[in-house]
Amino acid sequence: MIIVLLPAYNEEASLPVLLPKIHDVLVSHAEGYRIIVCNDGSRDNTAVLLEQYQGTYPLEVIHHSINRGLGESSRDLFERAAAVSNPGDFIIRMDCDDTHEPEFIPSLLARLDEGYDVVVASRFQPGGGQFGVSAYRRFISRSANLFMKVFFPIRGLWEYSCGYRAYRAETIKRAVSFYGNNFIQLKGLGFTCTLEKLVKLNLIDARFSEVPFVLRYDQKRSASKMVSSVTTLGYLVMTLLCYWPFGGWRAVYRGKAPDGDKPPISNDTPRTLIARSAIYVRYLRGSRQHRAFRSGSG
């Protein structure tokens, strides 16, 4: 079974486009599929449309009476997925605004079949990219990913901020069982939960990989929900929570992961963290030079 998780807030324009595309990609899957949507207090016709689509697609809806934010929506979605899935199932989490094309789902699933636990759709892999993203947003995104790579190094990952990912259901079930309600702890700090899931899964020794992905921001059909200042604050708070020597995540969870495995993050030092960022720094410099060339050639 493939379980697709969609956090939705004011997505009346996106749902009629996205749901048929998901269906077209997954309808032929031998084990079937299921979509779980969290309607996070939408003020438009999202709830009405979801009710209508329940007669067309294998769709379950979680309703929030008010807008609680991406953190709480993600928590409810992943806890529900852990409850209804079997260990052999796969979980796909993607955005509901039509910027994440379902056509990449097969490559995500194929990489899971290679033995990985978490596969991230990456703009930074060869063949990946993005359309419709301003130069400012590209700079912010790449800078944020550099920060995350330095302070939260995960083998096999360069793309930390994209929420388009595939998970083994057994990995999510193990994480929810291990962390309880703290699997997604920073629920009120914007998009910080997108990073938190990776960090928490890394602490239980999940295996990570990436596949190329093209972000279609030019197809976005709803207003952006991200508040950069709140998310930046969340990253700083998470850094303290992770590395605080008295009761921080590393101190509390290190060596206590299921099966007795130590998390790979435990062996990193500030020197190795900085060294690992060198490739990404060169990438940022190359991107700036490319933009300067394009500006000069116009």
Pin down the residues of each PLM region.
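Acceptor/aglycone-binding surface of glycosyltransferases and processive sugar-polymer synthases
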Residues: 60-83, 90, 100-184, 219-226, ...
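Acidic helix N-cap motif at the loop->helix transition within catalytic regions
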Residues: 13-16, 42-53
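A conserved acidic beta->alpha catalytic loop
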Residues: 39-48, 66, 98
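Hydrophobic helical membrane-anchoring modules
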Residues: 1, 107, 181-298
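Short, well-formed alpha-helical segments that are part of the catalytic scaffolds
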Residues: 11-26
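Short beta-strand/loop segment that forms part of the nucleotide-sugar
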Residues: 6, 31-41, 62-64
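Acidic donor-diphosphate engagement hotspot in glycosyltransferases and nucleotidyltransferases
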Residues: 18, 46, 74, 103-105, ...
